[in-house]
Amino acid sequence: MIRIATLNDLTDILSIEKKVFKHPWSIEQLSWELNSQPVTENHVMIARGNMIGYLFSHVVDDDVQILNIAIDIPFQHIGYCEQLLSYFLDQFNADSSIHLEVRKSNFPAINLYLKFGVHETATRKGYYSDG
């Protein structure tokens, strides 16, 4: 099941964030995104009664910025991230402009995005502190 994320999901999201990312978002960043900002569209994925992943984005008209997507470690590499991304992208039409950043070394994410027809349009030098 996929549903809109709320501030009540903060603890579970933070737990996944800290396990999945080398440089996790802070509780303040996550809280700000979950506090019903007018441009945020955030989703969580639930399996067997537990949160297993989430996607954070900003949407302004047809301009979509995927900010953060994560699946808890025990549920990775079995299709959940693809399901979450597919669900999210299906909400937009062909005229929508979808943007995201990904580390050049994050091959699983890059391969996932390629499945959805995403292609590189630019490189932001120094965007990530570790390359």
Tell where the protein language model's regions lie, with residue ranges.
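Acetyl-CoA-dependent GNAT
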Residues: I4-I78, E82-Q91
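Active-site-proximal loop/turn and secondary-structure-junction residues that shape catalytic pockets
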Residues: A70, K104-N106
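Long, compositionally biased, intrinsically disordered segments
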Residues: D72, D95, L112-Y113
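Short glycine/proline-centered loop/turn elements that form peptide/ligand docking sites
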Residues: C81, L85, N106-A109, G126-G131
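Structural preference for long, well-ordered alpha-helical segments within the folded cores
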Residues: Y87, N111-K115
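Conserved GNAT acetyl-CoA-binding A-motif
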Residues: Q91-V102
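Conserved catalytic-core motifs of GNAT/GCN5-like acyltransferases
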Residues: H99-E101, L114, H119-G131
